[in-house]
Every structure is written in structure tokens, then in C-alpha cells.
A protein has these predicted regions:
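Rossmann-fold dehydrogenase core element
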Residues: 60-78, 97-104
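Beta-loop-alpha module in the N-terminal Rossmann-like domain of NAD(P)-dependent dehydrogenases
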Residues: 3, 7-64
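Hydrophobic residues in well-ordered beta-strands that form the structural core
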Residues: 47-48, 72-74, 179
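Short beta-strand scaffold segments in enzyme catalytic cores
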Residues: 167-169
Length: 183
């Protein structure tokens, strides 16, 4: 009631009995396949990234979605944020000229302890965070020729596989593109 949520379900089974709703599936990647199997045929849903723990997981999830005629998307919302929409418009209108440099530098303190399941994952930073930046960059510059990435631990979160990444995207054009991400 505090947040004006009209209906709360006690289980996913109860929620999946609903008709004419959009399901927002936000579960750890290691259980996503099992949850997708339970989504009713013909439903509409948004899956929070990542789409499983591996390419094999993603392919199986895609297969289940197709077989059950589910309309689905994966949430990569950064490119739809107001600031990125405005930037995209400026780029499209040639207001900032030719893009020759694209660099993202981010240093934040993420409350990783709020998601203890992250400690079980082989990769954390790129599939759960930097993927938003990579998706946005691809929407602006297209697909890179190659990607070089190194993700490492951070001493403040020793139980996570990684929390920092250095990423270089190589393009055919005269574009230098790199990301330095520190959580």
C-alpha cells in the first residue's frame, strides 16, 4: 500500500495465472530458464539481463520463448534513458560532428551485498552492468570489429568474481572507443 502496488502475489505460480499482464522477470541468471518455462503461453514479458549464464542458456531461453509464442524483450534500458535519447538526437542531427572518440569512465560504489547470489557467478561486472554501456555504444557506432576486455576483482568485494573492467572496442573507422568501469 505504501507504494500503491495494487496486487502482490505470494508465488510465481500465482502470478502466472494472471491474464493480460506484462511480466517483468528479474531473477538470478542461473534460475532464468526454469522461470521462463513457467511463463504462460502467449504471454508478454521483459527479461532482466543477462539472458542466462551462457550463450547455451540464451539459446535455450530463446527456443522456449519461440515454442510458447511469448513476446519477450531483454531489458537494456540505458539507450532509452532521457539523457541518451537526447544525445542520440544530437548525433543524428550532426550537432556534435563526426564521432572519433567515445570513452566511458565510471567509478561508483555499488551495494553488491544486496544481491548475495552474485557471489556464485563466474562473471558479474560485464553481464550485469557494463552490458548497458556496450549496448548503447553499439546502437550509436554499430558492431565493433573486435572487443578486448579484462575484468578483475576489487578488494572491497573479494567474494565477487569481478567488479572492474577495462574494455576496448575496435572499429574499422577512425574511432577510439574504450570503457573503464570500477564498481
Amino acid at each position: 500500500k505504501e507504494f500503491n502496488i495494487e496486487k502482490i502475489y505470494s508465488s510465481e505460480e500465482e502470478a502466472f495465472l494472471e491474464k493480460e499482464v506484462v511480466f517483468d522477470i528479474a531473477v538470478p541468471p542461473q534460475v532464468l530458464i526454469e522461470v521462463v518455462k513457467k511463463i504462460p503461453e502467449g504471454s508478454i514479458c521483459q527479461l532482466q539481463k543477462p539472458m542466462g549464464n551462457s550463450m547455451k542458456d540464451a539459446q535455450l531461453i530463446r527456443q522456449i520463448i519461440k515454442e510458447k509464442k511469448i513476446i519477450a524483450c531483454v531489458n537494456l534500458q540505458l539507450k532509452f534513458s532521457p539523457m541518451m535519447i537526447a544525445l542520440r538526437e544530437a548525433i543524428d542531427k550532426d550537432m556534435i560532428g563526426q564521432i572519433t572518440e567515445l570513452e566511458i569512465s565510471l567509478s561508483v560504489k555499488t551495494p553488491w551485498h544486496l544481491w548475495p547470489f552474485l557471489e556464485t557467478l563466474d562473471n558479474v561486472e560485464v553481464p550485469l552492468h557494463s552490458i548497458h554501456y556496450l549496448d548503447w555504444i553499439r546502437s550509436v557506432l554499430g558492431n565493433p570489429r573486435s572487443v578486448h576486455c579484462k575484468s578483475i576483482k576489487h578488494p572491497s568485494v573479494p567474494k565477487l568474481s569481478d567488479a572492474r573492467s577495462s574494455i576496448i572496442l575496435e572499429y574499422e573507422k577512425d574511432i577510439r572507443c574504450c570503457l573503464s568501469i570500477n564498481h
